[in-house]
């Protein structure tokens, strides 16, 4: 069972992102403040959940959270400042949208940089430990999946409805055949490994 938050003295927001390892599309970051008594049996790291459960949980989170926000950082911006800084920027911008403003941040991952004057704690695999980070993980993932489904209608040849922009063999082969779309991250390696051809 997940702990609700990392600490209980200060109003805490859990933060996570989705799409960091993708070849195409924006990265999405989310920040969520949950009520202290929030519990849902399905809530866990979004990568461990079925798609159906993720979307069902998104409805619950959006309805029951004290506050939530999702922020998109485009592929163009990722190429400009790099994916790590784009993830940090996305989380910071999501936090700034929260009302009420949190007093503490619980961040999924091993590092974080922000200009926000807020204390924070980085937690490796935090989305499998704390409900507020898991909730942020669900929002970031589902909002990003919706976005990739929209892009897939424009560029069906890359299989984004299925791979969501991640570097699958099929996605890399499509890049080799059709070249890069305007939504591909130009600074990422799109080459297919020779071993993947066999």
Language-model features: locations:
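RNase H-like, Mg2+-dependent phosphodiesterase core
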Residues: 1-198
